[in-house]
Amino acid sequence: MSNQEPATILLIDDHPMLRTGVKQLISMAPDITVVGEASNGEQGIELAESLDPDLILLDLNMPGMNGLETLDKLREKSLSGRIVVFSVSNHEEDVVTALKRGADGYLLKDMEPEDLLKALHQAAAGEMVLSEALTPVLAASLRANRATTERDVNQLTPRERDILKLIAQGLPNKMIARRLDITESTVKVHVKHMLKKMKLKSRVEAAVWVHQERIF
């Protein structure tokens, strides 16, 4: 990002002090800039449409339109930026639900500042991000489903296997498309089919599964 314009971030959180703290942290990074902030979901959606930021940092628990409802609305807008949930909740249901409904990552608010800044850089670059403390949470979710869900990677086509490998490496659709010399829309179709065949809820869960089971 050093040879490009700074990555743009929109903050959607109902706590002014937290937004201020995140802005101060981001001000330390010359290649990321906060272009807008909203205290509720409705305002956040309006700003997201007008600003189309590279990254949206979204609180989960907000009065009125909550984070999941806001996430659904943002996904309906087909925005180009990544959407990462930023929450105090490490409950399995919250994490899995957010990822299933299209979040590109899930970060906890008690992260160390330097870890948060690193994660924001990764997310802005198109990578999936997940607080380290949440890996066991997703692993537990996978284990709970294992008894009733048998996943056989051999069900996948060669192309779907290639894409699963790249997802496990944290690559976004755009970079996968370049790597495989196919269109981004084709990648999206393959990802959808792959997740359905493997009975996985999200890209992040797919990545955790690959690493946990040492699929490749």
Curated annotation (Swiss-Prot):
Domain HTH luxR-type stretches: 149-214
A molecular function GO annotation: ATP binding
Positions bearing 4-aspartylphosphate: 59
Any one biological process term the GO annotation gives: nitrate assimilation
DNA-binding region(s), chain positions: 173-192
Alphabetical list of Pfam families matching this protein: GerE, Response_reg
InterPro entries with a match to the protein in the record: CheY-like_superfamily, Sig_transdc_resp-reg_C-effctor, Sig_transdc_resp-reg_receiver, Tscrpt_reg_LuxR_C, WalR-like, WH-like_DNA-bd_sf
Domain Response regulatory: residue ranges: 8-124
Domain of life: Bacteria
UniProt entry keywords in alphabetical sequence: Activator, ATP-binding, DNA-binding, Nitrate assimilation, Nucleotide-binding, Phosphoprotein, Repressor, Transcription, Transcription regulation, Two-component regulatory system
CDD domains noted in UniProt: LuxR_C_like, REC_NarL
SUPFAM superfamilies, per database record: C-terminal effector domain of the bipartite response regulators, CheY-like
GO CC annotation, single: protein-DNA complex
Signal peptide: none
Biological role: This protein activates the expression of the nitrate reductase (narGHJI) and formate dehydrogenase-N (fdnGHI) operons and represses the transcription of the fumarate reductase (frdABCD) operon in response to a nitrate/nitrite induction signal transmitted by either the NarX or NarQ proteins.
Name the UniProt record assigns to this protein: Nitrate/nitrite response regulator protein NarL
Protein's organism: Escherichia coli (strain K12)
Gene that this sequence comes from: narL
